[in-house]
Curated annotation (Swiss-Prot):
Belongs to the membrane fusion protein (MFP) (TC 8.A.1) family. This is Lactococcin A secretion protein LcnD-like. The gene is lcnD. PROSITE patterns: HLYD_FAMILY. PANTHER family: MEMBRANE FUSION SUBUNIT OF EMRAB-TOLC MULTIDRUG EFFLUX PUMP, TRANSPORT PROTEIN COMB. It is a single-pass type II membrane protein.
Length: 473
């Protein structure tokens, strides 16, 4: 007899519930479900990583050479803290005779060039040649090249659209030919069906049926079999059955031939339908002529504006040099105009003579607690779309320090136009941060590091889903 009290024993329950499923699979399943749920609520930061540097928020003063004589005392040193009115350069006391007339000639050339460049801009704006005479700087030729590009663009788009139109006409012509052929085949199937119906159920066949001769031939064969039977004297049952069997066989063969012909025609129709479905017209008409011409015009005006800016800058430099050239030898010494950190331009270090008006150094604000600095980086054009003013930037100093030096700033400016590098175009991004007192020992202007910009967040579920689907953020 089975003792029911054994059902209440702990050994029974232990053996029943302490199995592989409860000890391994169930915990792993719970862990997996928990991990999936975690991906729906936990967020991952989306970042853009680049290389950046610490730059000043402003330039306190710009230092230029005031004399072309040999330098006899040079106190220029990169990163040096200078006080206001401290001596930076001292020149030989004998003033060097320079050619002022050459500077004046250069100024006249720049003014003439500006006048011709202005005519180019007017020609581009009004879309007609505004040059009264041929200029010596090639700007009229530039406008003629622009007009040639516009005409070439118009001709290319017209040719492209004509090709699309011709292709569509050819496609429609082919479709119509196929449809006509299909209609002919369908009529042939109807003609065969008419004969098939006449053979099967005794219907009539129209006289204009092109396959009437086949039907007449079949009827003639049937009539021959019946005539042979009638010509026999007193045919027995066996002869009658043989004749009937021959008639059925003849009918079956004739119907089979009709069905085979119909199937062949249907196969041809199906093939034509496939051909017709593969013939598609094109709507790829190019309607971008106006926008492309506007783009050409904008590019040409942008290039001329940049050149005008360069000419204005050159003119300003020349006027500065002329003004300096007219000064007495009182400019035999250069002093710091403000207190700050000295940044010597790379090409100046080690020079014994520096032409008048040449920029030689810049003075940056002193680095002290709460000093504002820029975290400047260049972001490739392929990654700039997600970056906005106001986003956070983490800057990590790339040095062997016991503890990583991390600065956090806010993006204040993103250049509207990219800067060209050998590796490609990149946009300058400037973020502002304040230096803490504890960070001062490790911070210098020009210090490079890694910048990480947080451009958004998404759940880990969406992040892994995008990875699987091949989508990029």
């Amino acid at each position: 007899m089975f003792d029911k009290k054994l059902l209440e024993s702990s050994e029974l329950y232990d053996k029943r519930y302490r199995n592989f499923s409860t000890l391994i699979i169930l915990p792993l399943f719970i862990l997996l479900v928990g991990g999936v749920i975690f991906t729906f609520f936990a967020h991952k930061e989306l970042t853009v990583i680049s290389t950046g540097s610490i730059e000043p928020t402003k330039i306190v003063a710009k230092i230029q050479s005031t004399n072309a004589n040999p330098i006899i005392e040079n106190n220029l040193k990169e990163g040096k803290v200078v006080k206001e009115n401290s001596l930076l350069l001292k020149y030989n006391g004998t003033p060097e005779q320079t050619q002022l007339s050459e500077l004046l000639t250069q100024k006249k050339q720049v003014l003439d060039k500006k006048a011709q460049l202005d005519l180019l801009q007017k020609s581009l704006t009004n879309e007609k040649n505004e040059f009264p005479t041929t200029d010596s700087f090639g700007y009229e030729k530039s406008f003629e090249n622009y007009e040639s590009q516009v005409k070439s663009l118009e001709a290319t788009i017209q040719k492209s659209n004509q090709a699309v139109e011709d292709q569509n006409k050819s496609t429609e012509s082919q479709k119509q030919a196929i449809q006509n052929q299909v209609a002919t085949l369908q009529q042939a199937i109807q003609n065969y069906s008419e004969i098939e119906n006449a053979v099967s159920s005794g219907g009539g066949v129209s006289q204009d049926n092109p396959y009437l001769s086949q039907y007449n031939s079949y009827q003639a064969q049937q009539a021959t079999l019946e005539a042979d039977l009638k010509n026999q004297k007193n045919p027995d049952e066996t002869a009658k059955q043989a004749t009937k069997s021959q008639e059925e066989s003849l009918k079956s063969q004739f119907l089979s031939g009709l069905a085979s012909s119909k199937d062949s025609l249907k196969s041809q129709i199906q093939s034509f339908n496939v051909q017709e479905s593969s013939l598609t017209g094109s709507n790829a008409y190019d309607n971008s002529q106006s926008s492309q011409i506007l783009t050409l015009k904008t590019q040409a005006l942008s290039a001329s504006n940049k050149e005008m800016t360069d000419l204005n800058s050159t003119l300003t430099d020349l006027e500065t040099k002329i003004s300096l050239q007219k000064q007495d030898d009182q400019y035999s010494q250069v002093f710091a105009e403000q207190t700050g950190v000295l940044h010597v331009l790379p090409d100046i270090l080690g020079m014994k003579k520096i032409p008048i008006g040449t920029p030689i150094a810049e003075i940056y604000p002193l680095l002290k607690a709460e000093t504002q600095v820029n975290l400047t980086s260049y972001i490739p054009s392929t990654q700039i779309s997600g970056m906005k003013v106001g986003q956070k930037v983490r800057f990590t100093v790339q040095q062997n320090l016991p503890k990583p030096e991390i600065l956090t700033g806010i993006i204040k400016q993103i250049d509207s136009a990219p800067t060209a590098f050998k590796e490609g175009n990149a946009y300058k991004v400037s973020a502002t941060t304040a230096i803490n007192a504890k960070d001062l020992p490790n911070i210098r202007y020009g210090l490079q590091g890694k910048t990480v910009t947080i451009i958004g967040k998404k759940t880990y579920f969406n992040y892994f889903l995008d990875k699987i689907m091949g989508r990029t953020s």
